[in-house]
Amino acid sequence: MAAPQHTLADFVTDQWQRRSWFTWLMWPLSLLFGLIARIRRYGYQQGWFKSTRLPMPVIVVGNVTVGGTGKTPAVIALAHALAEAGLRPGVVSRGYGVKLNHPRRVKPTSKAADVGDEPLLIARAADVPVWVFPDRALCTQAMLVSHPGVNVLLLDDGLQHYKLQRDFEIVMFDTRMGGNGMMLPAGPLREPLTRPRDATLINDPNFRATPDKPDVYGMRLELDEAWQLNDPTMSCDVSKFADKRVLAAAGIGHPERFFASLRQAGLSPATLPLPDHYDFVQDPFADNPAALEADVILITEKDAVKCERFDDPRIWVVPTTPVIDAGLIDKIRRVVQARNPAIATPVTVGQSTATGMADGLDKEHQDGQPAA
């Protein structure tokens, strides 16, 4: 089966980067969306809706825009940094595209179809507990049953998940920033660009911090040695493929970011952008002309966790190492150290509580079983 066509999604994404007839056609709906978003956030701030305070500092990494900005590598980098600082971080994620009836532990041996591709990548890249469930407060409390030593939480893509109170919010952007600056559906914004946050993290190798913006930090993704999907012991620098016919494929939020990094490494690949979270149930390379002619097919780590069944020695995985400005790491450490993590019981404000969740889980759900 050929790679899926997503012309409509491409069209809308393109329109979100400018102000055009589409922008103004959607503008009335954007006003309504923006009003609802503001009321919702204000309602949680005022305690109209339930929200849970967990017995540990909560660090949120998220977007005000639709689409990928590099949250997953940022979470991995922060997990490593917090662990190196002597803390015991845990990660909670929604588990995008996965049907879950209860909180589930993500193990390095889990399947992406059971827990989601990004949580699985985090579990394999960072030696920390990773759990998934749409109700992140419930999920965290389940994690604490199995991992009572966790003393700081990283909430992956949870900026708009106000059911869970937080101590530090990181809003991420990439080179597209806020697009045309308009709310959905006229633009890519889930919330206004002016939304308060503790830090802004920009995934851009050319970003440079300036003194006039002390809470804006940069992140870059450095390419590591590629490894062969069928035999991970085989590795080489991606520059070795410069004289090969290369196809680069990516099912991430912004595939062009991956393609551009390969060009910067000296490659001139044909490209195959796939929808974000593409499941690879159908082989996108089977009858793609560029794939059939390619000597080498390069994919991302996020896609690799879904391609393990492919028996094709041409497929190589290109990992990246996220590098975050040290100033952001230091600021997070200060926030974590300022809060006493030894709170015994979650405190809930608003209409109801998630306290007591752990008692409602049977033993096999508490320890993450059945294993995914």
From Swiss-Prot:
<dbReference type="InterPro" id="IPR027417">
    <property type="entry name" value="P-loop_NTPase"/>
</dbReference>
<keyword id="KW-0547">Nucleotide-binding</keyword>
<dbReference type="GO" id="GO:0009244">
    <property type="term" value="P:lipopolysaccharide core region biosynthetic process"/>
</dbReference>
<keyword id="KW-0441">Lipid A biosynthesis</keyword>
<keyword id="KW-0443">Lipid metabolism</keyword>
<dbReference type="Pfam" id="PF02606">
    <property type="entry name" value="LpxK"/>
</dbReference>
<feature type="region of interest" description="Disordered">
    <location>
        <begin position="351"/>
        <end position="372"/>
    </location>
</feature>
<keyword id="KW-0444">Lipid biosynthesis</keyword>
<keyword id="KW-0418">Kinase</keyword>
<dbReference type="GO" id="GO:0005886">
    <property type="term" value="C:plasma membrane"/>
</dbReference>
<keyword id="KW-0808">Transferase</keyword>
<dbReference type="GO" id="GO:0009245">
    <property type="term" value="P:lipid A biosynthetic process"/>
</dbReference>
<keyword id="KW-0067">ATP-binding</keyword>
<dbReference type="GO" id="GO:0009029">
    <property type="term" value="F:tetraacyldisaccharide 4'-kinase activity"/>
</dbReference>
<feature type="compositionally biased region" description="Basic and acidic residues">
    <location>
        <begin position="360"/>
        <end position="372"/>
    </location>
</feature>
<comment type="pathway">
    <text>Glycolipid biosynthesis; lipid IV(A) biosynthesis; lipid IV(A) from (3R)-3-hydroxytetradecanoyl-[acyl-carrier-protein] and UDP-N-acetyl-alpha-D-glucosamine: step 6/6.</text>
</comment>
<protein>
    <recommendedName>
        <fullName>Tetraacyldisaccharide 4'-kinase</fullName>
        <ecNumber>2.7.1.130</ecNumber>
    </recommendedName>
</protein>
<dbReference type="GO" id="GO:0005524">
    <property type="term" value="F:ATP binding"/>
</dbReference>
<comment type="similarity">
    <text>Belongs to the LpxK family.</text>
</comment>
<comment type="function">
    <text>Transfers the gamma-phosphate of ATP to the 4'-position of a tetraacyldisaccharide 1-phosphate intermediate (termed DS-1-P) to form tetraacyldisaccharide 1,4'-bis-phosphate (lipid IVA).</text>
</comment>
<dbReference type="InterPro" id="IPR003758">
    <property type="entry name" value="LpxK"/>
</dbReference>
<feature type="binding site">
    <location>
        <begin position="65"/>
        <end position="72"/>
    </location>
    <ligand>
        <name>ATP</name>
    </ligand>
</feature>
